[in-house]
């Protein structure tokens, strides 16, 4: 993941966050679907995770760990 994109999103750049969400949505959705076993519930969980990621992004200390951090949120 592009560390600068993550840093820009942390600074409140909505376009950077939209790019992050687009880049990671599929992977987050697969994780949710594997856990929940239901496509509709996985979609809901992924959408909620994206909202939670936006809210919690300022708390991320190491932008290089964005992907692992975002997976923890979806779980």
Which positions does each model-derived feature cover?
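Structural recognition of an alpha-helix C-terminal capping motif at a helix-to-coil junction
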Residues: 30, 44-51, 55, 64-74
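Conserved short hydrophobic patches within well-ordered secondary structure
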Residues: 34-36, 57-60, 74-75
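A short, glycine- and basic residue-enriched loop/turn
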Residues: 14, 25, 39, 57-63, ...
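Amphipathic alpha-helical repeat scaffolds
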Residues: 6-7
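Acidic, Ser/Thr- and Pro/Gly-rich low-complexity regulatory segments
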Residues: 1-3
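Short, charged helix-capping/linker segments at alpha-helix termini
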Residues: 10-19, 29-48
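Hydrophobic/aromatic residues within well-ordered alpha-helical segments
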Residues: 20-24, 28, 74
